A protein has these predicted regions:
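Cytoplasmic helix-loop-helix junction between adjacent transmembrane helices
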Residues: 114-151
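Conserved MFS/SLC helix-loop-helix module at the cytosolic interface between two early adjacent transmembrane helices
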Residues: 70-106
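Flexible cytoplasmic inter-helical loops of multi-pass small-molecule transporters
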Residues: 195-225
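Residue-level signature of mid-helix packing/kink "hotspots" within the transmembrane helices
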Residues: 25, 64-73, 158
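MFS 12-TM fold signature
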Residues: 64, 94-99, 183-187
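Extracytoplasmic
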Residues: 8-42
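Helix-loop-helix hairpin linking two adjacent transmembrane segments in secondary transporters
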Residues: 141, 148-199
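Helix-loop junctions at membrane interfaces in 12-TM secondary transporters
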Residues: 104-114
Length: 244
């Protein structure tokens, strides 16, 4: 029953990570085109300008990783304090801004800032709220619910490179940025309309007192404890499979 009630939150998280799968590889998959957009001469692969263009893209990728690194430590604490919905919305909004930046900027520095922000959006916002959200929405099998995140990241990581080749060969490489931009807007809409189990429990806890408040808090603690349940062998196998 709980899984049905919070089905939209599960769909929201999975779609967000389908989008994240593209964000994770968008710079490397479109490196030459991005370098051209940022003002580098990419006509001769043997030239210093070509190498500088690729280095600029690599720098933006590195800033994405740095954004993940600096935000991963505090995202969980913030998520527990303000709830899952706000961080899912914030992450989607940041993704929209980042993809807009990638689409229009002609400056490598601005692109690096966008890369950093997308890293923060992923680890500081979505990882901190999305991972626990799917487990709380499906407490009967939290480990299995979590596997869906890895699955959708892998799906977009497999499909997106084919889109890159197709769009680039047809002269429409910017579609490679427009597609995840539109997906990010869908993520924002889903995050706004979806109910989240933790948020509902938190509101109920804040709106009651005495024994009722204790009961709601006990339900929240039980949901957190369920997420620490040792996964089955099949779940462990899938995690190892997608990790390597």
């Amino acid at each position: 029953m709980k899984a049905k009630k919070y089905l939209w939150s599960i769909i929201c998280v999975y779609f967000c990570y389908l989008t994240h799968g593209i964000q994770a590889i968008i710079l490397s998959q479109n490196n030459v085109n991005f370098a051209k957009q940022w003002g580098f001469n990419m006509a001769d692969p043997q030239s210093a300008a070509y190498a500088a263009g690729l280095a600029a893209v690599s720098t933006a990728v590195a800033w994405t990783g740095f954004g993940k690194f600096v935000s991963v430590w505090i995202g969980g604490e913030i998520s527990d304090h303000v709830g899952r919905k706000k961080l899912m919305i914030g992450g989607a909004a940041l993704y929209i801004l980042c993809f807009l930046g990638f689409l229009f900027t002609k400056n490598a520095l601005v692109a690096s800032v966008c890369g950093f922000a997308s890293g923060v959006a992923t680890s500081g916002f979505w990882d901190a709220s999305g991972y626990p959200a799917v487990q709380e929405a499906y407490p009967a099998a939290p480990g299995s619910a979590l596997i869906g995140i890895k699955f959708f990241v892998s799906v977009s990581g497999m499909i997106y490179p084919f889109l890159v080749v197709h769009n680039a060969s047809s002269g429409n490489w910017k579609l490679n940025v427009i597609i995840p931009l539109v997906m990010s807007i869908v993520c924002l809409v889903l995050a706004i309309i979806a109910p989240f189990a933790y948020d509902d429990q938190k509101k109920a806890s804040e709106g009651t007192d005495g024994k009722s408040k204790d009961a709601v808090q006990a339900e929240i603690d039980a949901a957190k404890a369920a997420m620490l349940t040792k996964p089955g062998k099949f779940v462990v196998f899938l995690v190892m499979f997608y990790a390597f």
